[in-house]
Amino acid sequence: MSDINATRLPIWGIGCNPSVGDEVTALLTSGEA
């Protein structure tokens, strides 16, 4: 269980935390641009 949770933690973190999602989006945008 702990391994599965650890693997899905980043995904759930981005989905639950708008601020984190914004940071990731900014990084992806700047990286692609």
From Swiss-Prot:
Residues 1-10, 19-33 form a propeptide. This is Alpha-amanitin proprotein. The modification (3R,4S)-4-hydroxyisoleucine is found at residue 11. The gene is AMA. It comes from Amanita fuliginea. Belongs to the MSDIN fungal toxin family. Major toxin belonging to the bicyclic octapeptides amatoxins that acts by binding non-competitively to RNA polymerase II and greatly slowing the elongation of transcripts from target promoters. GO terms for molecular function: toxin activity. The keyword Transit peptide does not apply. Signal peptide: none annotated. Keywords: Hydroxylation, Thioether bond, Toxin.
